[in-house]
């Protein structure tokens, strides 16, 4: 199905969110291209400064033991170190941007009915529980998979525990949880950054 067909099937609110995520993903893609371009320059700078430093050392050792040669060698070594650090920082930024883009792309896929990027919580299915086994609480296309945006095993366990809770809660507890959810709902940048950190963490496991 093409993009127009997808947007027609989505409600007004979903359509707005879908477009927002698409725009954000495109914006981040532009930043990624810029980082890649900078990365190529940093690699070239590292190679050139390293070679110039080696040449300076060779000239000093074999031909001229002059102060200017020593100074040139030190300068190129320092320039190499600076280029290396800038390249490392750029690589870290590139990794973060890729993770952020993955978050946006996962969300657009979710709005299109594709939930595969999110854990389905099958491991929490308990046939002895009052309702978690019979109802679509866990598993593919389940409630857990639809609302799961956790990035740690602890967070996933906590969410599963909330969904399986059978005891009663006080009005204050319910209101506090509702307020926390509403606060996170309006802070899109915080949510995205948090989930991006989780994407990076999973990639390094």
Give the positions of each predicted feature:
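Switch/coupling subdomain of P-loop NTPase systems
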Residues: 1-43, 47, 53, 60-63, ...
């Amino acid at each position: 199905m093409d993009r127009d067909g997808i947007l027609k099937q989505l409600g007004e609110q979903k359509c707005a969110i879908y477009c927002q995520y698409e725009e954000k993903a495109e914006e981040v893609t532009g930043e990624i291209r810029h980082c890649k371009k900078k990365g190529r320059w940093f690699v070239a700078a590292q190679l050139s400064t390293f070679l110039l430093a080696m040449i300076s050392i060779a000239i000093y050792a074999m031909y001229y033991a002059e102060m200017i040669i020593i100074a040139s060698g030190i300068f190129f070594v320092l320039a190499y170190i600076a280029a290396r650090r800038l390249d490392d920082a750029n690589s870290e930024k590139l990794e973060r941007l890729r993770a952020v883009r993955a978050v946006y792309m996962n969300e657009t896929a979710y709005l299109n009915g594709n939930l595969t990027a999110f854990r389905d919580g099958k491991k929490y299915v308990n046939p002895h529980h009052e309702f978690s086994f019979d109802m679509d609480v866990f598993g593919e296309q389940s409630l857990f998979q639809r609302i799961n945006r956790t990035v740690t095993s602890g967070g996933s366990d906590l969410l599963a525990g909330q969904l399986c809770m059978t005891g009663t809660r006080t009005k204050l507890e319910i209101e506090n949880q509702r307020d926390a959810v509403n606060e996170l709902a309006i802070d899109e940048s915080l949510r995205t950054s948090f989930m991006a950190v989780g994407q990076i963490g999973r990639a390094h496991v």
